[in-house]
Regions:
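Solvent-exposed loop and capping/linker segments of extracellular ligand-binding repeat ectodomains
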Residues: 1-184
Length: 184
C-alpha cells in the first residue's frame, strides 16, 4: 500500500475491521497511512456489534532540513503515539491505554474517553482513568455526542453511571438546546 493512499481523504471517519482484536490485521498499515482522526472498530462478520473500538487522534508531522542537510523530524499530537501500539500487526492494548493520561487536545479527549463504549482488555487503571475523565468532563463529552447526533453514545455514557445530578441536568439542558428530543 502506498503512503499516499488516503491523501486528501478528509471524510473518512471509521475503519471497520472484520476480525477480532486479538488477530493480526492490516490496521497498523492503515492507521499509519492516515494522519487525520479516525476510529477503528473490530467488528467480526456476523456479530451484532463491534467487539472493540479504538480512536486514533490526528497528528502532524514536520520534516525540516537544516543548512547542514540534517533532517529534523517532529510529530505534534498524540495520534502518532497511538499508531505505534502494534507488534507483528497485533494491537497492544496496554500500551494503547497507557497513552491516555499523558494528555490530549480538548476534542480528542472527549472521544478517547468513550473507549468504554467498546472496551477490550482494559486494565482497572485504564478503566478508572477513562471513567474519571468522563466524570469531570461530562458536559464536554455530551456536547460532542449531541453534535454528532450519537444517541447510542449518549446511552452508553448514561449506562456508565458517571453523571451526578448536576451533570445529568446539564446534559438535559444541552440536549434541549440542541433540539434533540430523543437525547433529552
Amino acid at each position: 500500500m502506498g503512503s499516499d493512499v488516503f491523501l486528501n481523504c478528509f471524510a473518512l471517519e471509521d475503519l471497520i475491521i472484520r476480525a477480532t482484536p486479538e488477530q493480526a490485521t492490516g490496521l497498523f498499515a492503515l492507521v499509519g497511512s492516515i494522519t487525520e482522526a479516525v476510529r477503528a472498530l473490530f467488528w467480526p462478520v456476523g456479530e451484532a456489534a463491534p467487539r472493540a473500538g479504538l480512536w486514533y487522534p490526528a497528528y502532524w508531522e514536520d520534516i525540516e532540513e537544516t543548512p547542514a542537510h540534517i533532517l529534523l523530524h517532529t510529530f505534534s499530537g498524540q495520534g502518532y503515539h497511538y499508531r505505534q501500539c502494534f507488534l507483528e500487526n497485533k494491537l497492544l492494548p496496554a500500551e494503547y491505554d497507557a497513552i491516555f493520561p499523558q494528555g490530549h487536545a480538548a476534542d480528542d479527549a472527549s472521544v478517547m474517553a468513550m473507549l468504554l463504549r467498546w472496551p477490550w482488555q482494559l486494565s482497572d487503571a485504564a478503566r478508572d482513568a477513562y471513567r474519571d475523565f468522563l466524570k469531570t468532563n461530562t458536559g464536554r463529552v455530551l456536547t460532542r455526542l449531541l453534535k454528532a447526533q450519537d444517541t447510542e453514545g449518549i446511552k452508553t455514557l448514561l449506562a456508565l453511571d458517571v453523571m451526578d445530578t448536576d451533570a445529568f441536568a446539564e446534559g438535559a439542558a444541552l440536549a434541549a438546546k440542541a433540539d434533540n428530543a430523543e437525547a433529552a
